[in-house]
A protein has these predicted regions:
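Active-site-proximal cap/loop segments of hydrolase catalytic domains
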Residues: 1-215
Length: 215
């Protein structure tokens, strides 16, 4: 995975001003290698991640959609241009990641944004985000959701967590996130697929009923 740590400084810098490709193509290469070795079913692979991993998920569910059967995007990036105007780290974005301001390379930032590739998206995508996130503003998830919902080419769901930031801190939100992620993957990778699973979760019923037993 070009741009990751553990292989020296030069390797870690390979994703600077090189968003999405080749770094997310490296993830796909890993999937294809596992398929070639007969370890996974090529039609039953999902992808998930948070923050930059959420960006990887959104990209994979749009630009590389034919390779993934399900995706769960958490506090992720969908628009590299609008992210500059809504994040609390614009200077870090320029100095470390993009190595450019939007006015320096507008077209590149647009084309490395998942929303640009939304018409290709056929992967069922669950999007979750904290409403109080200042690092990656929840509008990033709202944009991705609205583009995919408008196109109508794949199931999409948006879940927002009140009071949560760039990662859920409260136990209830952590549980809710985990259960939604697992259910989405179960539904599309092992279940019947099609329309999304019901929005409500069983733990909500248990809380309302005051019972620990599964309904």
């Amino acid at each position: 995975y070009r741009g990751s740590t553990g292989r020296g400084d030069e390797f870690a810098r390979l994703d600077q001003h090189a968003y999405a490709d080749p770094e997310f193509t490296d993830i796909l290469d890993g999937k294809l290698a596992l398929v070639k070795d007969g370890m996974v079913d090529t039609d039953k692979v999902g992808i998930t991640g948070g923050s930059y991993g959420g960006y990887a998920t959104a990209w994979s569910a749009t630009a590389l959609s034919e390779h993934y059967a399900a995706g769960v995007m958490f506090v992720g990036i969908s628009n590299q241009l609008s992210k500059f105007g809504t994040t609390d780290i614009p200077n870090e974005m320029q100095a470390v990641h993009a190595r450019a301001w939007p006015w320096d390379d507008y077209q590149w930032m647009l084309e490395t944004s998942p929303i640009y590739h939304a018409p290709k998206g056929k992967t069922p995508l669950l999007i979750m985000h904290g409403e109080a996130d200042t690092r990656v503003h929840p509008s990033q998830s709202m944009e991705m959701y609205r583009y995919l919902k408008t196109l109508g080419n794949a199931p999409v769901r948006l879940v927002l967590y009140p009071g949560e930031g760039h990662g859920n801190r409260k136990a209830a939100a952590q549980l809710d996130y985990s259960m939604r992620l697992m259910r989405w993957m179960e539904h599309y990778l092992k279940g019947k697929g099609g329309n999304p699973p019901p929005y409500d979760l069983k733990h909500e019923e248990k809380l309302e009923n005051g019972s620990d037993s599964e309904s």
